Every structure is written in structure tokens, then in C-alpha cells.
């Protein structure tokens, strides 16, 4: 188990008093972490939403602030070596089979049939390999409304598009799948990252069709049906514009080697 150190700094210009929901803290509360918020250099309160943590979510924090420049800073270590992955429940599997906003799997059933193999693991591996081989990583080819079908037709996208297409195709062949927002040591350029997870046997297996970072050192931030559930920042009221973001994720020692075909579980 690699225990990376992670950090994020988000800068918002607040034009009118705003309430912002943030999901940037590690889902498994680290032994050592700090989360601070300031507006024009003066501290403002940030609170963790009660009940927001859990196997299917991440820890959500709320900040209420007036006009000015809001700076949110988070730093923490990764999960402890003793942290264990959480097995899917029956309800988890049901939720992870349903179509969702960015993963309209019900519209891909006929197309996805080509990936069926002798068992679910072989089917998932075929899907992940084909998503990797058929898409071009292109940050200019995607937007906030792009869903898995848009990505399939365009043949290009970013990490969230790779994850959405992987998840949608898995659900279309009756394999429960979800997304996980993560810190990703080794990612270049550094950013928040989105990967897919499938419920196979007694655990959630993580897949990254971009192959841009080793899965063994990923640090879970939030988990959900698709990107709508795991957004790092959501303006709930007021007027706020994200004007800056800096992400850091560092492994403890050398990065692990990942062939992106083996079985990896995230705590």
C-alpha cells in the first residue's frame, strides 16, 4: 500500500455572497489533514456536512462567504496502510446498474453486447481496453454536458469521459459500475482525476482507461454514479467563479508499476 500526500488549493472570485459545497478532502479521514478557507486573507468558517461520508460518497464541506477572493486549501496524507477496501452491498450493486445523467447505459445495450465474454471480468477488461484504444485524450473536445454517448461518437475526451464511457458500457452488460474522484500521484499535468470501479466477486475493482497514473497509489475523494455526484466544487447559491486551481499528489517513494490489467482495489 502506497500512502501518498495530497493537497489542493482552489481560488474563487465571489461576486455576491455565496454558499459552495466542496468535495476535496480524502474520503477516508487521514491521520493528518488541514482544511482552511479565507476571503481576502481573513479566515472564514468551513463545516463538514453531517452524514456526507460513507461507502458511496465522500466528505462534503460547506463554506458560506461574502464578496472577495475565496481561497480554499486542503492538505492530507493518504489512507493508512491498514485501510481496507469496502465490499459492495446488494443495494450498492442495484444503484450501480442504473442509468445516470452522464452514463445513459440503457441507450448502449445493443452496442455493448459486442464486449460480452465468458465471464464478467473478461468483459470488463475488454471494455476498458477498447475505451483506451478508441479514444483520444483531448481537453478541447468535452464540456460540462458531455455524456458517455457524446464521447463514444466524438472519439475523444478527458478522464471523466473515459470513466463515463467505461461505466456506461459496463452497466449496459449488467456489470455494476460507478465512478471515483481521486488524487492521482504520477498524473501529468496534475489535476483531479476520475476513474471507474466495477463490482466483481466480493469487491470494487478500479479501472483507468486513460492509463495516465498507477491505480495502486490513487487516493479516493468521492464516489458516485457519475461526475454529477463527485464534483469538487458546486456553487449552491450566489455568484462565484473558479479562477485558479493547484493540485498536488505525491507517492511515498517510487510510483508503483501498473499494467492496467491487474486487479486493484481502492480503500
Where are the regions a protein language model picked out?
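Intrinsically disordered, low-complexity acidic/polar segments
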Residues: 17-20, 31, 81-85, 205-207, ...
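Generic structural "secondary-structure junction" signal
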Residues: 22, 137-139, 154, 185, ...
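Hydrophobic/aromatic-rich core segments of domains that either
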Residues: 129, 161-239
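Ordered, amphipathic secondary-structure segments that act as subunit-interaction surfaces
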Residues: 74, 78-90, 95
Amino acid at each position: 500500500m502506497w500512502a501518498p500526500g495530497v493537497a489542493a488549493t482552489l481560488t474563487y472570485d465571489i461576486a455576491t455572497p455565496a454558499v459552495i459545497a466542496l468535495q476535496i478532502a480524502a474520503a477516508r479521514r487521514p491521520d493528518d489533514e488541514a482544511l482552511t478557507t479565507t476571503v481576502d486573507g481573513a479566515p472564514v468558517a468551513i463545516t463538514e456536512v453531517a452524514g456526507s461520508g460513507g461507502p458511496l460518497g465522500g466528505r462534503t464541506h460547506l463554506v458560506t462567504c461574502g464578496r472577495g477572493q475565496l481561497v480554499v486549501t486542503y492538505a492530507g496524507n493518504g489512507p493508512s496502510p491498514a485501510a481496507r477496501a469496502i465490499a459492495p452491498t446488494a443495494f450498492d450493486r442495484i444503484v450501480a446498474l442504473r442509468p445516470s445523467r452522464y452514463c445513459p447505459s440503457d441507450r448502449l445495450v445493443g452496442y455493448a453486447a459486442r464486449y460480452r465474454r465468458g465471464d464478467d471480468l473478461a468483459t470488463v477488461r475488454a471494455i476498458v481496453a477498447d475505451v483506451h484504444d478508441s479514444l483520444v485524450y483531448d481537453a478541447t473536445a468535452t464540456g460540462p454536458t458531455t455524456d458517455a454517448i457524446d464521447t463514444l461518437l466524438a472519439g475523444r475526451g478527458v478522464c471523466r469521459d473515459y470513466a463515463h464511457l467505461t461505466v456506461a458500457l459496463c452497466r449496459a452488460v449488467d456489470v455494476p459500475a460507478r465512478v471515483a474522484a481521486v488524487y492521482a500521484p504520477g498524473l501529468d499535468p496534475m489535476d483531479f482525476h476520475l476513474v471507474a470501479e466495477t463490482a466483481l466477486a466480493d469487491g470494487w475493482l478500479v479501472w483507468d482507461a486513460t492509463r495516465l497514473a498507477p491505480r495502486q497509489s490513487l487516493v479516493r475523494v468521492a464516489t458516485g454514479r457519475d461526475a454529477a455526484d463527485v464534483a469538487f466544487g458546486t456553487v449552491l447559491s450566489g455568484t462565484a467563479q473558479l479562477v485558479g486551481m493547484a493540485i498536488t499528489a505525491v507517492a511515498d517513494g517510487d510510483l508503483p508499476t501498473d499494467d492496467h490489467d491487474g486487479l486493484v482495489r481502492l480503500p
